[in-house]
Each structure stands twice: as structure tokens, then as C-alpha cells.
Amino acid sequence: MIRIGPSGSTTQAKSTLEAVDIVADMGLTALEVNYVRGARASEETTRKVGAKAEQRGVTLSAHAPYYVSLNSPRDEVRDSSVTHIVETARRCQWLGAPFFAVHGGTYGGKESPEATDGVVERILTVQTRLEEEGIVGVKVGLETTGRPSAWGTPEEIGSVAEQTDIVIPVVDFSHVHARSGGGLKTTEDFQALVDWALEVSDCQLYCHFQSIEYGEKGERRHLPVDRWDPDFRLLAPVLRQIPCDVHLIC
């Protein structure tokens, strides 16, 4: 099944609880709860959102804080980044959300292999903390990034997934398109990326799609889907043929 919905509360909603109703009333079936400025929502409120979503047939995911930086040269930033991920996972468990998206941050002045090793180390710490704190059934979705300065190519994310038990990729098609200088030009380009993600994630696809403005340094800003860059009409037939669940955030 393909489930489609927005990230964050709509402009009409005063709360995430209201956003669930608005999304469902629009005929959409997915919502990404934004914790981009901190995962601080109370357990009571979060469980109410999860119950409302289940009642209305909306599948939830979440987005971790933007200030996660797993390769920061500062110990306290790396440690707080781990905590941000753990706290997002905790709220996903309360929500009944099976996964959430997180950006890994920059390379921290390191080459790709060393930076990837650093991400593995931090994710293994997250994995241990989740086990110790009884947070189960939630996957950490490492999101593909839109700038060469940001850690998060498909190859890097795949390497972390291979070395940990809790990681799946979050394929942001616009980010991949921008980082590659407009590389998603054909249905075959999208198919190859989707095939990779399904293999790494054991046949589940959590993805983002928007159009995007980009330049030599990658992404500049997100744009409405109907700017057709990348072209959703090339991706649609690929999504229709996927034999497992798709969680598409637009």
C-alpha cells in the first residue's frame, strides 16, 4: 500500500492532534510528526496523537531534530545528538510510529569512510540505549542529503545499515537529485534508487519527495512538486509496482 501525506502540522492545525484529523479529512494516509526543534512532547499528548492516528487510518512517522551532528568535533554535541535520536525514538514508540527520519550532520572535517565509521559508532550507542530503555519496534531512518558537505549518500547510509540492526534509509528523492546535479532524469534512475532502498530496508520504503532548486553546492531550497524537478511522473510508475508498503512524505 502507498501511504501519502505531509511533514508537520498543516497551516490550519493548532496542534498535531488536529493535524491528524485534517490529513485524514483530505483523504491522505500518512503524517510525519516534526520534532525538528526538539523531541519534548509529553507521553500523554503523544499517545493521544497515536490513538487518533490509528482511529483515522493515518500512519505516523517522525523527524528528529535538525541539530543532530553525529560527526561533530565536540564530544558534547555528539553525545547530545545520540540523546536527540533516542528521545525521538521514544516518542515514536508512544505514537505507534515504526520509523523516523534523521539527518546525520556534516562530515566533521573527515573523509567519507572515517565519518561513516563515526556514524556507525554513534548509532550503535543509540541501539544499546534503546535496548536498555525498552524502546523497541522503531527504526532509525538515516536520510539522504542534498549537499556534498553533508554526510548521507546512499552508499554511506547502506554501510551503516549493514553494521547495525536499527537503521533503514529514508530516501529523499529531491536531495539525491540535487546532490547529483540533477541525476534523477529517467524512470530507470528512480528504479535503481528504489531497488537499493528496498534491499537495504528489507522491503519497506520510507521516502520524501518535493521539487528542488539546486546548484554547484547542491540543494538551495525545496519547491512544490509541480515544478517537476525532479519529475514525479517518472517516479509514480515505480512506486505502483513496489510489492510492499510505501510511506511517502511530500
Report the location of each language-model feature.
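Charged helix-capping and loop-helix junction motifs
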Residues: 44-51, 78-85, 116-121, 154-158, ...
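Gly/Pro-rich active-site loop or hairpin
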Residues: 113, 151-154, 177-245
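Hydrophobic faces of well-ordered beta-strands that scaffold small-molecule active sites
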Residues: 2-8, 31-33, 60-64, 100-102, ...
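Acidic (Asp/Glu)-rich catalytic clusters
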Residues: 20-27, 40-61, 87-96, 124-136, ...
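Active-site-proximal flexible loops/turns
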Residues: 12, 16, 39-41, 70-72, ...
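Active-site acidic/histidine proton-transfer and metal-coordination neighborhood
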Residues: 54, 71-171
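N-terminal pre-domain/capping segments
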Residues: 1-87, 168
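Active-site beta-loop-alpha junctions enriched in small/polar residues
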Residues: 7-11, 34-38, 65-69, 105-107, ...
